């Protein structure tokens, strides 16, 4: 049963992500074809899949899964934003796919804005690596999949700082000097960002 539910969520995540989303051309829009395909997926779930669950009963769970896939490390969205997304979802017509896809795009736009802001902030920190305080008495969870999300932007930015500082410390403990650490982390950030910028809808659907 758990496997079948995961299959349902996978299909529904595809429905939320059907988009033509392309960070490459910076355009985020969906077409009538995407809406039609979303409706077809819903019909399959409700009428042909062996669980035959009604879409409204699992829409919130599907949106939650979409958010977790976008932000598994819980360092992009604030808790109040997650609560707002899920609350708005409860008030929507579950079968209005134009509204659902529009909301998914709005969420992805915020995700991309935050991703870029985090990248820029951490790059700046690396450019000033010699002045970083590596003796802070703060802990960071290696696995944040179950961690609490930040409650405001200030704490979110502090989390970004902590993540970068932790990466610096780990490389230093592995025997890298500051220049080597700076080079390696800068390369890592750039590679991750370049990969993100090349994302196309087909890639997102493979999540």
Residue ranges, per PLM feature:
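Bacterial N-terminal signal peptides that target proteins for export
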Residues: 2-8
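Bacterial N-terminal signal peptides
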Residues: 10-16
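Compositionally biased regions
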Residues: 5, 20-23
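Flexible, low-complexity junctional segments that flank or bridge functional domains
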Residues: 22-207
